[in-house]
């Protein structure tokens, strides 16, 4: 589950993954070439790299990052990769700073396999620079035996102010996710730059922090909820899918106030050393076989429409888990934008929120 478990995988050294069973023949188009991939940890199917190497004759060298910001620093400082897998708002920033090269759509024959829901988004409306890799939502995982669905329906994010759940909640140790929750609870855009709205969200978080005794976690939320240690938590959809698969008492709720609808996508940096091989890799990941292996292993929603429908069907691996299918078309859901003013302000305020907890 990328969004949290990546922090563990990123501690490892860069890995070189070489396919097994290659005949070593020289008739493959990219025989002997190298692809340098920079991705989140725990974010690829187990056979994705080996199968691509077998098919192309190339060798894939993978580095892992645990945040978009960590990735950005290396790319902005000139470190060369062929493929990156950043999130929506970071793609917007990379485009604005002219750090990406346009894709050659003639090399991407599998684009028609993708769901319309993942294409033509605001950060790259023509998909000139990015091709979707995974997508999902942020929502509430809760114990159906202990948390009332009526409370969730009536209160939405304000359930985190409901004192009957005091001491039984997990929250991400993340200013971005926490302020998203607070801003949405108050009816504001999570992309606001309005000082009064940001201040109101800060005060909401202070109130929650001082009355609800939340437990702030990172990857611990996954096993914690799977083990039933708390009753309610803010969780990314792929992690929620895992929690539900491990504990049948857990369910997933997307509040009526709206949430973060997020997208991670593949891009080619401007200084890529092998852009042709990069686009071959991107096109390969869109195939049914590659997309199926990715989504089965990671648990996040595939951009490949056939894969998503198969895995979410009655007989599918994730058919019983509502977290697997993102809510699309809901007007109050938003994609994070690159907003330096908001980012700087909430980082400062988050330190104060955490310091206020007794």
What does each of the following model-derived ranges do?
Residues 15-19:
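C-terminal motif of bacterial Sec signal peptides marking the signal peptidase cleavage site
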Residues 21-23:
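Bacterial signal peptide processing site
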Residues 38, 80-226:
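Extracytoplasmic ligand-binding site segments that recognize negatively charged/polar headgroups
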Residues 90-93, 226-227, 232-249:
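A ligand-binding cleft/hinge motif common to bilobed small-molecule-binding domains
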Residues 199-207, 246-270:
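Periplasmic-binding protein-like
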Residues 264, 269-330:
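Mature extracytoplasmic/periplasmic domains
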Residues 326-358:
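Conserved C-terminal helix/tail region of periplasmic/extracytoplasmic solute-binding proteins
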């Amino acid at each position: 589950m990328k969004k949290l478990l990546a922090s563990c995988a990123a501690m490892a050294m860069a890995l070189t993954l070489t396919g097994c069973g290659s005949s070593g023949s020289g008739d493959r188009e990219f025989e002997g070439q190298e692809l340098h991939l920079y991705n989140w940890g725990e974010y690829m199917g187990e056979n994705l790299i080996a199968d691509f190497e077998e098919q192309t004759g190339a060798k894939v060298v993978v580095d892992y990052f645990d945040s978009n910001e960590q990735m950005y620093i290396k790319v902005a400082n000139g470190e060369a990769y062929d493929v990156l897998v950043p999130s929506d708002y970071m793609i917007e920033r990379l485009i604005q700073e002219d750090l990406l090269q346009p894709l050659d759509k003639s090399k991407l024959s599998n684009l028609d396999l993708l769901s319309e829901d993942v294409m033509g988004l605001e950060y790259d409306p023509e998909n000139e620079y990015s091709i979707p890799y995974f997508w999902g939502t942020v929502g509430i995982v809760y114990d159906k035996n202990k948390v009332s669905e009526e409370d969730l329906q009536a209160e939405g994010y304000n359930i985190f102010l409901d004192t009957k759940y005091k001491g039984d909640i997990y929250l991400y140790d993340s200013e971005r996710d926490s302020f998203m929750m607070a801003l949405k609870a108050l009816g504001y855009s999570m992309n606001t730059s309005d000082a009064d709205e940001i201040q109101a969200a800060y005060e909401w978080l202070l109130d929650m922090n001082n009355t609800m005794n939340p437990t702030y976690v990172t990857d611990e939320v996954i096993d914690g909820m799977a083990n039933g240690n708390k009753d309610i938590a803010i969780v990314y959809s792929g992690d929620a899918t895992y929690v539900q698969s491990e504990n049948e008492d857990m369910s997933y709720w997307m509040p009526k106030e709206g949430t973060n609808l997020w997208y991670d996508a593949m891009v080619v940096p401007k200084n890529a050393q092998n852009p042709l091989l990069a686009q071959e890799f991107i096109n390969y990941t869109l195939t049914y076989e590659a997309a199926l292996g990715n989504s089965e292993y990671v648990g996040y929603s595939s951009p490949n429409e056939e894969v998503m429908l198969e895995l979410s069907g009655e007989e599918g691996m994730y058919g019983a888990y509502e977290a697997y299918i993102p809510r699309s078309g809901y007007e109050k859901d938003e994609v994070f934008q690159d907003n330096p003013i908001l980012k700087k302000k909430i980082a400062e305020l988050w330190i104060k929120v955490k310091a206020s907890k007794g």
